[in-house]
Each structure stands twice: as structure tokens, then as C-alpha cells.
Design a protein with these regions (language model features):
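Active-site neighborhood of divalent metal-dependent phosphoester/pyrophosphate hydrolases
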Residues: 1-17, 160, 164
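Active-site regions of metal-assisted phosphoester/phosphodiester hydrolases
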Residues: 24, 28-31, 37-182
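Soluble non-cytosolic domains of exported or imported proteins
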Residues: 16-20, 113
Length: 182
């Protein structure tokens, strides 16, 4: 999950997780249905709107082998919106080690960061042969930013939307949101 925020001033519940952390609230709801096999991991990249710790989360079910967060950007300051962390959770599933990465990349128009370099840092974070699944928001519009979209594909990544046998129209956000203003 991306943009899993919590208010800076909220009460700490455990580790770096606060009472109003959406992922924690989701896990609590899942647990209320009698599920208890999920683990929750969260980290944040930067402060948003002067009041939120803006972060990434992964809910994992199964044997967790490793958890790591790292910056893919040259900016690594929580006070810079250009700072982007990646959350990686490694699971063992059916005797196979699989790395899951929750990503929220900068917009291609970000002038403070080299998007190609950020993607390179992400894709080449580990050199092992484990299956890697990159999930999240790459902030690239397939319809209007073909060059940027193709750059992602040229890095060796597969777009699961393109691989799907059944598809909708491919648009998840139909109007401008914060950061997309003209």
C-alpha cells in the first residue's frame, strides 16, 4: 500500500506505528474477523502537508524471512517530498523465496530527482535471483507519458495490467489529485 499516512502528533502504539495509521487500522479490522495470520510492516519517506508521516505498508501472510526499507532517491530527508523510500518484505511461499516491494515513486516531472536513476536503484537493489514483485504507484500515466512508461518497461519490469486477460479501461484516478494540478 502507498500513502499510508499517520498524523505526526498521534499517539504511538508500537515501534513507529501510531494510533491512526491506516494500515494498522486495516489490520485491526481484519483481526476482528478472527484472522490473526497477518504481519504488518510500515515505513515513511517524508512529511506531507506539514502534518502527516507519509508512508508505505505491506500486509503479509506467511513466513516472513526479511524486512527492509531503503531510499531509492538521492534525497533522503523526511522534510523533502522528493525523498522516496521503498519497503521490501521477503516471504517464503511454497518453498520459494519471493521479494515484495511497496513503491511510491516521484512524478516524472520531479526536477529534484533523476527518475531513471531512482528506478535503477529500485530494480538493482539486490542481485540475488529471487522472484521480485514491485507493487505500487509509479506515478506514470500510460496514456499521456508513453516515454516514461516505456522507460519502466525497458528496465525489465512487466506491467500486470498489460498481462491481464480481463481488463477495465486502465484508469484508477479520473480527476486531478494533489500533485497533479496543471
Amino acid at each position: 500500500m502507498q500513502e499510508v499516512n499517520q498524523l505526526i502528533n498521534s499517539e504511538n502504539v508500537y515501534s513507529n506505528i501510531k494510533k491512526d495509521n491506516f494500515g494498522k487500522m486495516l489490520l485491526d479490522k481484519i483481526n476482528s474477523y478472527g484472522e490473526s495470520d497477518y504481519s504488518y510492516y510500515w515505513t515513511y519517506s517524508h512529511i506531507g502537508f506539514d502534518k502527516y508521516e507519509e508512508g508505505l505498508a505491506i500486509l503479509a501472510k506467511g513466513k516472513v524471512c526479511d524486512v527492509e526499507d531503503f531510499y531509492c532517491t538521492s534525497h533522503q530527508d523526511i522534510h523533502s517530498i522528493s525523498s522516496r523510500k521503498i519497503l521490501k518484505v521477503t516471504l517464503e511461499i511454497n518453498n520459494q523465496t519471493i521479494e515484495f516491494y511497496s513503491c511510491h515513486m516521484n512524478l516524472p516531472t520531479c526536477e529534484d530527482e533523476n527518475i531513471r536513476e531512482n528506478l535503477y536503484n529500485l530494480v538493482n537493489h539486490t542481485d540475488d535471483s529471487n522472484l521480485k514483485i514491485f507493487m505500487g504507484d509509479f506515478n506514470t500515466d500510460y496514456f499521456n507519458q508513453k516515454k516514461d512508461y516505456n522507460m519502466i518497461i525497458e528496465m525489465g519490469l512487466f506491467d500486470t495490467y498489460e498481462m491481464a486477460q480481463k481488463k477495465d479501461d486502465g484508469v484508477t484516478v479520473y480527476k486531478n489529485i494533489s500533485g497533479w494540478e496543471d
